[in-house]
């Protein structure tokens, strides 16, 4: 089968990579084309030749109405590119991973064009904008949920779904972070042997620019308290990001604020507390 998968952020890249592994295992002849990131691309290259990555999410993950308005032209161009690419490739199914701001529009278009549409990791309609349930009913052929409490919710709403647990649990269980000691983690990242408070701002550009100033203010105030003066604050950055995304926020705080990339599980494991932006983390 031909699978067209769309993931628009770091969490979707993680979910997408695990999904792709499962697809290749169940369907060795699977042909996959996708929007995603490094993790999905790594799985693709293990099983297929050529280029499967259409759009890297790092080139434009955005949040909120203001960000969409400011980047309306590029957003519109991405829709055009996406629709044209799906039409040209003609997949057996379009699989959408979370990212509702973009994927709901794709779901509507793909459904109206006669493509099967699967939504993997249901959008959090139970938390906000519940009216989107109408779109799920109208445009999605199969909905995959990951939280047990979603079972009675979607049952009550009359939406058919598939529940097989949460793939993040498998990812955490298989993480090398669980096999590494605190001493090894600190040594590998050249970190001092002091208590850790984790800071998780999110992976999107908009999240980083919105949350890092808040997190740095928090770190400053905590560091100024005698009982927390020796703590280190570790920013758990997405693997897709670089130090340039954080340097202006960390500047002048290097003595007590550190940044590590692609090690969220390890940072959380070895932290005594965490401040976490809403999201997959």
Model-identified regions with their sequence ranges:
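Glycosyltransferase donor-sugar binding loop
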Residues: 233-243
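Active-site and donor-binding regions of nucleotide-sugar-utilizing enzymes
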Residues: 3-189, 200-212, 221, 225
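Generic structural signal for residues in well-ordered beta-strands
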Residues: 32, 161, 233, 257-259
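Nucleotide-activated donor-binding/catalytic signature segment of Leloir-type glycosyltransferases, i.e.
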Residues: 246-263
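A donor-sugar binding/catalytic signature common to diverse glycosyltransferases
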Residues: 38-40, 260-281
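Charged active-site motifs of nucleotide-sugar-dependent glycosyltransferases
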Residues: 2, 191-198, 231-232
């Amino acid at each position: 089968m031909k699978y067209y998968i769309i993931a628009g952020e770091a969490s979707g890249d993680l979910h997408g990579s695990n999904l792709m592994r499962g697809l290749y295992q169940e369907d060795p002849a699977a042909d996959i084309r996708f929007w995603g990131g490094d993790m999905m691309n790594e799985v693709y290259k293990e099983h297929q030749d050529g280029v499967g990555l259409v759009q890297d999410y790092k080139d434009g993950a955005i949040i909120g109405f203001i960000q969409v308005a400011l980047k309306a032209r590029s957003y519109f161009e991405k829709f055009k590119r996406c629709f044209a690419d799906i039409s040209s490739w003609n997949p057996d199914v379009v699989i959408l991973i979370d990212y509702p701001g973009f994927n709901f529009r794709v779901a509507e278009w793909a459904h109206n064009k006669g493509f099967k549409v699967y939504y993997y990791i249901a959008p959090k309609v139970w938390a906000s904008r519940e009216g989107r349930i109408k779109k799920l009913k109208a445009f999605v052929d199969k909905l995959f949920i990951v939280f047990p409490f979603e079972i009675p919710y979607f049952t009550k709403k009359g939406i058919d779904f598939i529940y097989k647990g949460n793939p993040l649990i498998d990812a955490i269980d298989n993480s090398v972070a669980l096999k590494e000691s605190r001493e090894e983690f600190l040594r590998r990242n050249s970190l001092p042997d002091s208590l850790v408070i984790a800071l998780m701002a999110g992976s999107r550009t908009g999240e980083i620019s919105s949350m890092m100033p808040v997190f740095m203010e928090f770190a400053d105030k905590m560091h100024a308290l005698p009982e927390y003066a020796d703590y280190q604050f570790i920013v758990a950055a997405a693997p897709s990001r670089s130090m340039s995304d954080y340097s202006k926020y960390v500047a002048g705080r290097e003595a007590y604020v550190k940044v590590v990339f692609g090690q969220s599980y390890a940072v959380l494991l070895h932290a005594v507390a965490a401040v976490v932006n809403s999201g997959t983390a």
